[in-house]
Amino acid sequence: MNLNNVYNFKNPVKHFLNIDNLEFPSNITEYPIDNLTWTEPIKFRIYKEKDKYRTLKMPNILNFVAAYYHYKNLPEFEDIQSSDWVHKRLVANVDTGDFASGQYDLQLEGDFNCLCIYDNLIRLDIKEYYGRIYTHNLDFSNQEERYLTNMNTGATNGLLMGNYLSLYFAEEYLSKISHSLENKFIENEIECDFSYFSDDFYFFCNKKDNEEVVRIFDEVLESYNLERSDKKRIWTYESFNNYNLVARYWKKLVAHCNMRFKSEKTNNKLYFINQMVYRMSNLDDDKLKRVFINNVFKIRYFRELPLEKFQVKEYDYHQLCFLMNFSPEAMLYSVDRFAEMKAFKKEKLHHFFKVRYRECLKKNYNEEQLYYFYAISIFGYSDIIEENKGLVAKSNNQILISYYLRDNLFGQEEINFLKNLTDEEYWFQNYHLILYSSELMNDIEASIENFLIPKTVVLSQCNKQSKSNKREEYMKFYKTNLENEKAIIREIPFVKEVISEYLELKMKESEKMFEDSDKWGE
């Protein structure tokens, strides 16, 4: 098991972390709950839509790994969909740390089939679902609940967003909601096929039943102390068909570009970049456009394209910059290939990265800041990295700050600023602050006490032996890893390698899915 995949499920930030590199207690697979205390997660902000962001919360690593081993044998733990095969759309793959490839296309076909049968599709979702789950209502199968709540300062109201454990419990709870909905539709004699992806529900029904379907959804949610968000979309076959163009577009793009490519030539044009800009302009919303851009760079066509047989025109540079600016995540899957391309003049992108990185650091999107840092590192723009150290120090991006600490990029002014951030919520960057400071390492136990020990068991709070024992466990964990120079972040060349391995797994998974679907159709 790759612990990074469960610590940050789905989010690409997992590629930058190396939790498996850390040394854990020898009894971590059966770690006593009495060795753990309430801990505070770090906040990591990711882009949601327009000017909004969502906050992921990454739990204390010792607490999380202990919880993972405690819960990993629960029913359907690595096969979430099996808890509700009929209605659940979400298929998780812990080997890739992502949702299974190919499922979207299969489910889309099912949606169109339903829209041939029913008048419309109503899409509804649950308001602030993760934040409103009461942990006492979850089924722990007689396992200890505190492994979960200890990761979130002991809170029983709400789950941390971003890790696989929270996903598992949230999906198990959704299975119960789904069962209640099914019974209500049968009880009220309403013809309705429904499915759900996380807290996003798809109801296929006839127009005359629309209001009743929404009413039942509200009623069921209320019985679970939840409520529906204000967002509501109704689709017909025609409107749904016009909206869902992403898969068709990238397939057309590949077919079009393959026809233009001549293997005997060394001056082929990068038509696919122009085609991406053209095709995305026909998509309805920004989310679909970002999915389209990311998917093109993730598929085998681009990853194995013989770029040495292409020339780069001036317009290719500004179109590529446009795509990366629109979807910064795409940089993770593309810049390594362009950096290795002989005809690609990386100096053409220097000003773009100089301006965009600085602007990104002034905003709230931590993951995009990390993507820019990765691309700038791959292209070797060290001047851009260094000149933004002041903004990085105050960015609240603990992962990015840790990279700057590793590379000794901060001056004394920034270091002094960071040393004042002693609250527990800064434990991730403070771990690296100690690791890369000879001064703090020379007095390692005092440094751990000051920057890393959970606030519930700092020395001043240890008025009981049980608290002293807990404090000692965290002290040993941090001290062992710091003394053995174990960073939680990966070196950028290894990030590049891990991303390549992830993409290869995703491509193979997708290819197998379509091979299997072809067999089913025979």
What positions do the PLM features span?
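Short, conserved secondary-structure transition motifs
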Residues: 160, 164, 203, 233-251
